[in-house]
Structure formats: C-alpha cells, structure tokens
C-alpha cells in the first residue's frame, strides 16, 4: 500500500475534486503550515470549534452523547482549557477514491506544544469535511488558530479496489458537513 506523492495528490485534486478548496503548494510564512506537501496534504481548520465543558456534569457516553457537553465558538482562534479537548472541522472537503485510505497525523508545531490531533481513517469512497479532535495535554490553556494547518493527510493506495467501500455500506458520517458529534446506527 504505497504512499501517494504530491504529483498524484495534485492531479486527483484538480481533475477529480478530491480536495476542495485545494492549495497546490505549502504555505508556511507566519502560519501553521498548510497545503500540498511532498507526500501528503496539510489540511486547515475552520473558525468553528466545539470546546468540551463539564457544566452539566454529564457522563461522556458515545452511545448517548449530550451535545450540551460543548460550547460553540466561532473565532480566529480558540483557547482549549488545560487537560481538555475541542472538536473542529476541516476547511477542506475530501472525496476519497475507492482504492485509497487516508490517515491523518498531527502537525509538529502543535505536537511540540502538547497539542494532539486525532482523526479516524478516511475510508475508501468516504467524502465530507473531517471532524477533528484536538486534545490539550498540558496544564495550561492551548491556542489553536483558525484557517491554518491542523493535520497532515497521508494517502495510501491499495493494489486493488476494496470489496465494500464506505459509500457502499452507507457509512453514518458520509457527506458530513459541520462538526459532527458521535452517532450510533439504530
């Protein structure tokens, strides 16, 4: 399952709409970098964040998640409380080809500050805005900047198409826009 290069990513983004909007180079000056890299794509985060709070003393249960556990914030940056987390959304909309699976890893600028990014794999034929979990592992507030890089998407291509894609199984997060909270199929 080889990793795909900048040439392949550019071609798929421009000819097949795999990444929209697409930045065909890496933007680095004065920002957390974003755009096309040698073997990946640094996606950005929007200005919409859901910051975890324990105002209602709710239990965190993925099967019965209480949306009141979050405070909605729209801003150029967000400060995540110590030892807490926020959810955010990628600026880019992704359309993953049937023979490709993607993993997302955090940006070193954030990781070196104790900020960890978690995203589950982008499966074959999944499409949507990525919901991103951002953890502040430090005992201090941690700042995240909107419209700047948040994680690098690596594209891994199989030597054959999968038998059942995310679209085929009608995955519950297919076509998601906005920040999507946990869902359980009925």
Swiss-Prot record:
It comes from the Bacteria. Its EC number is 3.5.4.13. Keywords: Hydrolase, Nucleotide metabolism, Nucleotide-binding. Pathway: Pyrimidine metabolism; dUMP biosynthesis; dUMP from dCTP (dUTP route): step 1/2. GO terms for molecular function: dCTP deaminase activity; nucleotide binding. GO terms for biological process: dUMP biosynthetic process; dUTP biosynthetic process; nucleobase-containing small molecule interconversion. It catalyses: dCTP + H2O + H(+) = dUTP + NH4(+). The active site is at residue 133. It holds the Pfam family DCD. DCTP binds at residues 107-112, 152, 166, 176. InterPro entries: dCTP_deaminase (IPR011962), dUTPase-like_sf (IPR036157), dUTPase_trimeric (IPR033704). The keyword Nucleotide-binding applies. It is an enzyme of class 3 (hydrolase). The keyword Cytoplasm does not apply. Gene3D superfamilies: 2.70.40.10. Belongs to the dCTP deaminase family. Homotrimer. Catalyzes the deamination of dCTP to dUTP. NCBIfam families: dCTP_deam (TIGR02274). This is dCTP deaminase. It comes from Chloroflexus aurantiacus (strain ATCC 29366 / DSM 635 / J-10-fl). The gene is dcd.
